[in-house]
Swiss-Prot record:
EC numbers on record: 4.2.1.6
Cofactor annotation comment: Binds 1 Mg(2+) ion per subunit.
Official protein name in the record: D-galactonate dehydratase
Keyword Iron tagged: no
Enzyme class: lyase
A Pfam family: MR_MLE_N
Protein source organism: Ralstonia nicotianae (strain ATCC BAA-1114 / GMI1000)
Sites marked Increases basicity of active site His: D258
Length: 382
């Protein structure tokens, strides 16, 4: 069996799918994308195709090492996202060839169902509460919310009070009938994060995500030492070597690698094992499409320390396509009381509607991150 072609499809809302074809007619799908940098990742995928065409897709480990070590420069979001999507597609092919889901190739199930959570957007508490209630009616009781708007390096007591008041109102609306994490998106400096996290403690959020940027990861241990709230991070770390440093430094209670950014299934399986050795939970980051979610689920179902899985059903920025619009076997990804069952089909278990993918790719949006600015005109963290 040999790889014959790689084809990429940029799609609404802001995703990109990859199809890898073989000379035996078996094809695999992956999802290599950085939202706002899809064209850049697409170029990287096709540049890496030179290492893949003519090779046996079943030699996943060898191909992964070739893509990673075959150049002098390595790592980073662009290259690792390209490798991630390729890796997903290779596992999809191998599972289809052998007639089993990918999790069977990774040792089999450690659980029968996986708890998921929903991301709820909105800045006004009333909007957030309404969104949570709608999802709660559908069986969800775990959520993730924005922790705050962008903050300056040293910001005002008013900004801190506004962020805390918002969380207090949400907690008052639900009591302890729901759990929610707070995502700061690295928009807070370490001095402000210390103040803000301490003020949020009475409202007992499930976790505090990315209180500071991954580039400031040395702050995680210091922040964790000053609070009883679990600190989560990892969506902007791209290899086991980056995760190794934060695990050794301590401070993180939850790792959140992204299966479409951190080298795919091959790399994230290693990251999950490293996290377990440090008694750290796993909650893969996944605001993307169905292939990325399926890849996450295969890691979740073989990793004992996997606790929560993010998914993007109903997320406010899925404009132009919903999570399962490009999937034929939608029932296989049905949620039951906030839980999802293991994929049942061979490979990743996603039956992609290729005709729809081709059609929608003809009008793909060229989405870019908006530039935000502070009141003084300086650029704010996105």
């Amino acid at each position: 069996m040999k790889i014959t072609r790689l084809t990429t499809y940029r799609l609404p809302p802001r995703w990109m799918f990859l199809k890898i074809e073989t000379d035996e007619g078996v094809a695999g799908w992956g999802e290599p994308v950085i939202e706002g940098r899809a064209r850049t990742v697409e170029a990287a995928v096709h540049e890496l195709a030179d290492y893949l065409v003519g090779q046996d897709p079943r030699r996943i480990n060898d191909l992964w090492q070739t893509l990673y070590r075959g150049g002098f420069y390595r790592g980073g979001p662009i290259l690792m996202s390209a490798i991630a999507g390729i890796d997903q597609a290779l596992w999809d092919i191998k599972g289809k060839v052998l007639g089993v889901p990918v999790y069977e190739l990774l040792g089999g199930l450690v659980r029968d169902r996986m708890r998921t959570y929903s991301w709820v957007g909105g800045d006004r508490p009333a909007d957030v509460i309404a969104g949570m209630k709608a999802l709660q009616a559908g069986g969800f009781d775990h959520f993730k919310l924005n922790g705050c708007e962008e903050m300056g390096i040293i910001d005002s007591a008013r900004a801190v009070d506004a962020a805390v008041a918002r969380v207090a109102e949400i907690r008052a609306a639900f009591g302890n009938t729901v759990e929610f994490g707070l995502d700061f998106h690295g928009r807070v400096s370490a001095p402000m994060a210390k103040v803000l996290i301490r003020a949020l403690e009475p409202y007992r959020p499930l976790f505090i995500e990315e209180p500071v940027l991954a580039e400031q990861a040395e702050s995680y241990a210091r922040l964790a030492a000053q609070t009883h709230l679990p600190i989560a991070a990892g969506e902007r770390m791209f290899s086991r070597f980056e995760f190794k440093r934060v695990l050794e430094a301590g401070g993180l209670a939850i790792l959140q690698p992204d299966l479409s950014h951190a080298g795919g299934i091959t790399e994230c399986l290693k990251i999950a094992g490293m996290a377990e050795a440090y008694d750290v939970a796993l909650a893969p980051h996944c605001p993307l499409g169905p292939i990325a979610l399926a890849a996450c689920l295969h890691i979740d179902f073989v990793s004992w320390n996997a606790t929560l899985q993010e998914q993007s059903m109903g997320i406010h920025y899925n404009q132009g396509a919903e999570l399962l619009d490009y999937v034929r076997n939608k029932a296989d990804f049905a949620l039951e009381g906030g839980y999802i069952r293991p994929p049942r089909l061979p490979g990743l278990g996603v039956d992609i509607d290729e005709a729809l993918v081709i059609e929608r790719s003809r009008s793909a949006p060229d989405w870019r991150n908006p530039v935000w600015r502070h009141a003084d005109g300086s650029v704010a963290e996105w």
